[in-house]
From Swiss-Prot:
NCBIfam families hit by this protein: cbbA, FruBisAldo_II_B
Binding locations of D-glyceraldehyde 3-phosphate: S50
Known EC number: 4.1.2.13
Subunit structure comment from the entry: Homodimer.
InterPro entries, per database record: Aldolase_TIM, Class_II_FBP_aldolase, FBA_II, Fruct_bisP_Calv
Cofactor(s) essential for the protein: Zn(2+)
Protein name: Fructose-bisphosphate aldolase 2
Biological or metabolic pathway of the protein: Carbohydrate biosynthesis; Calvin cycle; Carbohydrate degradation; glycolysis; D-glyceraldehyde 3-phosphate and glycerone phosphate from D-glucose: step 4/4
Gene (UniProt): cfxB
Organism: Cereibacter sphaeroides
Active-site residue list: D83 (proton donor)
Function: Catalyzes the aldol condensation of dihydroxyacetone phosphate (DHAP or glycerone-phosphate) with glyceraldehyde 3-phosphate (G3P) to form fructose 1,6-bisphosphate (FBP) in gluconeogenesis and the reverse reaction in glycolysis.
Lineage: Bacteria, Pseudomonadati, Pseudomonadota, Alphaproteobacteria, Rhodobacterales
UniProt GO MF annotations: fructose-bisphosphate aldolase activity; zinc ion binding
Positions of Zn(2+) 2 binding: D105, E142
Residues engaged in binding Zn(2+) 1: H84, H198, H232
Amino acid sequence: MALITLRQLLDHAAEQGYGVPAFNINNMEQGLAIMEAARACDAPVIIQASRGARSYANDIMLAKMIEALAAIYPEIPLCMHQDHGNNEATCMTAIRHGFTSVMMDGSLKADAKTPADYDYNVDITARVSHMAHWVGASVEGELGVLGSLETGESEAEDGHGAEGKLDHSQLLTDPDQAVDFVKKTQVDALAIACGTSHGAYKFSRKPDGEILAMSVIEAIHKKLPDTHLVMHGSSSVPQELQDIINAFGGAMPQTFGVPVEEIVRGIKMGVRKVNIDTDCRMAMTGQFRRIAQQTPSEFDPRKFLKPAMDAMRDLCKQRLEAFGTAGQAGKIRIIPMDDMAKRYASGALAPKTA
């Protein structure tokens, strides 16, 4: 099986200068769509599951599904990642069920709603890093709170999102604090806050530097050139997908996502992992709506799901090609987690923060 840790994959991405989209999964159809896209362009992939996805699909089902995908597509390096873990138990149970990487989001407290202070974030993230590295699993941390610079609010997704009004000091990661955070927590990747948010309704207009602070990414990369940065909430919310949904009975108000060209710019400034969920949902549900309206007599779920899978596959392939991930799968020789654990223990994988 071709399961790979996040650390090894992002190390390779940094060496070769590309980024890796991280696609969220809830079911078999999404998994197949992602892997078909990866096979079509010889790309490694990150598949991630939120706590909501784990509850929806069941940990055992998800674990067996990932085993199956790795067996069906043995040539594709596949990282299975826990998205937005809220405490140590969430992260450790993910590893127990076969995840090769976890995110400990200590920017919020365990309720996934209350913004946490810096010391809390450092303490819990460092504990998860220490435990995960024992077994060779990778850890992503988060510094700063995801949310809109326009509204000062965060968008909840799968029960995860800050409540109340947030100021810019919370919504933008401080570069100097980022250095201290990486040094103290030993994370393998750092999710930063730059004005992006979960869901479809990210921006009320095409984003510029006032509401999408790419300058923050640049500043952090200058201070932490060897740290893998992560952009969350980075769906582009394509106009054509909004139009398909609304043409077939949907009622999505006009909205704007993170432009692909801005993500590509971020990749040049150290962004190695790019979280994408909403775009995949829109690609699939647009086809559900189309088929329901065009063929109202249809009742075979496969007649809905196959076109939806194809649409998501095409979306994923576009992102893999745009981010430079395409053509990289065959260049990677996977390091087993046991060997990664030895490298962590030796200090060889300690972050460079000087």
